[in-house]
Structures are given as structure tokens and as C-alpha cells.
Amino acid sequence: MSRLEELIVKFCPDGVEYWPLENLGEFYNGLTGKNKDDFGNGNAKFISYMNVYSNFSTKLDVSDTVKVGKNEQQNQVLYGDVLFTGSSETPEECAMSSVVTVDVAEPIYLNSFCFGLRLFDKSIYLPNFLKHLLRGEEVRKQLCKTANGVTRFNVSKPKMAKVTIPRPPLPVQEEIVRILDNFMGLISELEAELVARRKQYEQYRKELFAFGDNVEWKMLQDVCVIKHGSDYKSFGHGNYPVYGSGGIMTYVDRYAYDKPSVLLPRKGSLDKIHYVDQPFWNVDTVFYTEIDTSKTIPKFIYHYLLTVDLRRWSNVGGVPGLTQSRLNKIAIPHPSLPEQERIVAILDKFDALCNDETAGLAAGIAARKKQYEYYRDKLLTFKRKAG
């Protein structure tokens, strides 16, 4: 019998209680009454949408700031709080959770596109247990059903209040945290090694694009036409991928474009640039590009734009966003076609070494993540206590 099984037999042999969120805590809103200027001249830190979306444990060492007046009634984020994203382009990406698992040393706030849950009694859950539990399959299925919408989905707090989660005894929580944190530690080690390799790749890529005045520079609008995406909900299921800002969302029976294209984010994940060389559809949170391949290799544009910090071209605060007019003004080098081909061939090889999930470090990380998810969902499935 494992240590966890022994603890379950000792502390909850008849199962565990499941409680609705409304009985466990109180929801609170993120920042209110803020405009663009408040985010451009900040005096206090805030937790961004992407911070919540991307991290099981909330990152507090952030550079995002907002101006908050001395007497303003804004909700501060505290240790043990659970933060949720309030909207996304698909129900599956709504209500993503992030838990404050370390002490908060200074006032820090939550962006207006997210909301928080503060427990009435913080002694009944370990924050590190909640970070795993709320990302587990059983709870995520419930959270996804709280979203309403057509082209963009918003979380319903009344529905969120009815979501139920297990409440195992603390010794059981501690053992589950120990096991799952060990898995995450192994993943982190591999990710750190991959980060180091990617830094080498990025440095070499930077050197390849260090043209200076030796080549002609053009605006992005001079080498491609940026086009909007649109809704796909009325289409049937098919073989053509539908791209959102985070990548492939689903597959449909028609396509918007069938030539090589670089997909650029309009909202959401601004670091997600995609290269597509097969027919595809894209939603309105992503732009696609039409490129004259007799003058410019689409993959060359893709590799170069990976060196551009698109966040600098974004609106400030809230959900990150880009416009056609801003993207059109990005300067891009335009060497001869043979030189473009040479650079693309080199960078494709490096990209495969760093990102190919069928081999190397990326494959190891993908395998570890699947292993973690398997054990997480297995360990977090409890027998319900009768009554």
C-alpha cells in the first residue's frame, strides 16, 4: 500500500466531501475604472491576463504596473487567492486558474479581464494543492461549462459558484502535492535545459538577421497583405485546421486561404506566431498574410518576426491586442531570394532541434507532461462521501 493510500484509509476511508465554490469563498473583481494612461504610468504592480492563463502558480515578480490612487477601492491579491481568466475565444480556454502560492510582499492587483476567489477559511486547502486540483480534468470540465458566448466566451460567475471541488484532509493534500510537485520539478529541469538551448538558437538567429544597411529594409505592408479572420461556428467538421491566437482550435470543412502564410495575433497570446503551409481557416483573433512568393519567402518573414517583440506594438493594459495599421509599420529586411532561402534552411534545422516534439528535449518534456497529467487526474479523483 502506498503512502497516499494509507493516508486515505486513515483520514477519509468513506470518501471526501465535494463543496460548491460559493460555500468555500467569495469572488472579487479585478481592476475597475482604469484607462490606457493608468497603465502607461503605473505605481503598483498588477497580475496580467497571460500571467493567470499561463501559470499554475501566480508569478508575483512582475514588471506590469498600473496607477492606483491612495484612496481607491481596488481589490488587492492576497496569499491563497485563486485567480481566474474571465474570457477567451473558446470555452475550453475560459476560467483558467492560477493560485497565489507564496506570500505577497507588496500591494499587487489583478487585471480587469480576470477575477479572484478568496476562501472564507484558508486553512482547509493548501494553495499548492489547489494549483493542481483546479487544472485537473474533472474540475476543468465543470469550469468550461461556465462560459457563454458565440465568437468570444465569457465566464458566468453564478455558474462558477455552483462548480464543486473535493475537500480531502490536509495530510492527503500534502502527499498529493509532494508527488505532483516532483513531476513538475522534473519537467522544470528539462524546460530549463531547453531554454538554454533556445537562447543559443535565438542568438544565432539574431546574428543571421544582423543585416544593418547591407540590404533593403521594407515595411511589412510592402511584402505582404494582412487579412482579418472570421467566425467558423456555422461550418461542418472537416480536415482544415482553424487557428486562434493559441494555435489550432478545431477542424472544419472549408478554408479561408490555401497558400503558405504567416499568422499574426490580433488579441491574446502576442508571442504566438504561426507558419502554415496547408489550407486553413482563422478566427478574428488572428490575422493571416498573403505573400507574393516570387519576391519573398513566407518562412523568411516568419523567422524574422519571431525576433520582433510584438508586445511593444500592442495596446497597454488589459487583454493584449494588435492592429493592422501597427503591424504594417514593422520594418523587415529584404535580401535576395537565394539569401532568404539560405537563412530559412539554417533556422529550420535549429527550430527542429529545439521544438520538434517527436525527438530531443521537446519530446522529453511532452512525455513528462503527459505523465504528470495522467497521475494528476488519477490522484485527484476521489470517492464521494455519501450524504
Region spans (language model):
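Short, conserved phosphate-binding/catalytic loop or strand-edge motifs used
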Residues: 3, 158, 199-205, 325-326
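Accessory (non-catalytic) regions of SAM-dependent nucleic-acid methyltransferases
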Residues: 1-11, 378, 387
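Structural preference for solvent-exposed beta-strand-turn elements
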Residues: 17, 32, 50, 151, ...
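DNA target-recognition domains and sequence-specific DNA-contacting regions of bacterial/archaeal
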Residues: 25-164, 221-332
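Non-catalytic DNA-recognition/assembly elements of restriction-modification systems
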Residues: 8-31, 210-242, 364, 375
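A cross-family "folded-core" feature that marks the main globular domain of proteins
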Residues: 55, 59, 177, 200-205, ...
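Short amphipathic alpha-helical linker/capping segments at the junctions of internal repeats
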Residues: 103-107, 194-210, 351, 361-380
